[in-house]
Regions:
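A short helix/loop element that forms part of the nucleotide-sugar donor recognition site in Leloir-type
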Residues: 53-55, 186-198
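Nucleotide-sugar donor phosphate/pyrophosphate-binding loop at the beta->alpha transition
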Residues: 117, 127-147, 187
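Conserved donor-binding/catalytic core segment of Leloir-type glycosyltransferases
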Residues: 8, 156, 197-214, 220-225, ...
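An aromatic- and histidine-rich active-site surface loop
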Residues: 76-90, 94-127
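Carbohydrate-associated surface elements
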Residues: 161, 180
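Membrane-proximal helix-turn-helix segments that form the acceptor-binding/catalytic region
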Residues: 87-90, 113, 137-155
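N-terminal subdomain of nucleotide-sugar transferases
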Residues: 1-47, 92, 224-226
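Glycosyltransferase donor-sugar binding loop
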Residues: 45-47, 181, 207, 231-247
């Protein structure tokens, strides 16, 4: 009897839902496990933001979780955890090693030289982001991008713009597979009204990370120039964030 198709995943911090990459990995892995694949996620060690009960959870919705050595210092957590995840993936019995994001892809050569098929998903051109525009981080991430081009058997991108970038910059073909969404469940907005005093169709919601590349300042400027009685709503004072970005 043939063993189940085995896949290793790394690049995420940990499951379940810490950020965009973690959500993608969770949704992908649970579906693969449901379809009969043996999926192992190599996560960062350390405290889980969702609560202590997740810290050493070995299995999550059919996904095997393993926690790798992580140096808890700024700039080293992602590098160290990605290195050890790549090392375990390289020596493990996996058919495919699936790496998420450009930084972790720096180590794509490691499973590749040991005969593994390597897939890299590019979630964005990370070295262009404001927080990585200078210093070691930017150089490391950009080299990760180049290593993905050189060593990955397949590259997945989430947007046509990134697909064009890889084609124009490296002449590399990629697979355009945008993120999907689960079918939403419609609920009455009673809690929103009760907690925030907001009613249906009375507000414009900003939902996203509060980082410069999201362009919140443009939203605020546009809102200031629109005649409306709607409220502009965010997870914190997005006006304050926008003002900070402009300074």
């Amino acid at each position: 009897m043939k063993d189940r198709f085995a896949v290793s995943m790394f690049g995420q911090k940990r499951l379940s839902r810490e950020g965009g990459i973690e959500i993608v990995v969770k949704e992908l892995c649970t579906r693969m496990a449901r379809d009969g694949c043996q999926v192992t996620c190599y996560n960062r060690s350390g405290h889980h933001v969702s609560g202590a009960e997740y810290d050493n959870k070995i299995e999550y919705d059919g996904i095997r979780q393993k926690f790798v050595l992580t140096i808890e210092r700024k700039g080293l957590a992602a590098v160290s955890s990605s290195f050890f995840a790549a090392l375990y993936s390289a020596f493990g019995k996996y058919d495919v090693v699936h790496i998420h994001a450009e930084g972790p892809a720096f180590f794509s050569w490691l499973p590749k030289i040991l005969g593994k098929r390597v897939v890299v998903t590019i979630h964005g051109i990370d070295w262009q982001r404001e927080k990585w525009k200078s210093g070691f981080g930017s150089k490391f991430i950009r080299q990760g991008e180049k290593n993905a081009v050189k060593y990955a058997d397949e590259i997945i991108v989430l947007s046509k713009g990134v697909q064009d970038y890889f084609k124009d910059t490296y002449g590399r073909e990629t697979h355009f597979i945008p993120n999907g969404v689960n079918r939403p469940e419609t609920r009455e907005a009673g809690l929103i009204t009760e907690k925030f005093g907001l009613t249906k169709d009375s507000y414009i919601l900003f939902l996203g990370r509060l980082v410069p590349e999201k362009g919140i300042r443009y939203l605020v400027e546009a809102f200031k120039n629109v005649k409306t009685d709607k409220k502009l709503v965010g997870s914190m004072s997005i006006v304050g964030v926008a003002l900070k970005q402009n300074n």
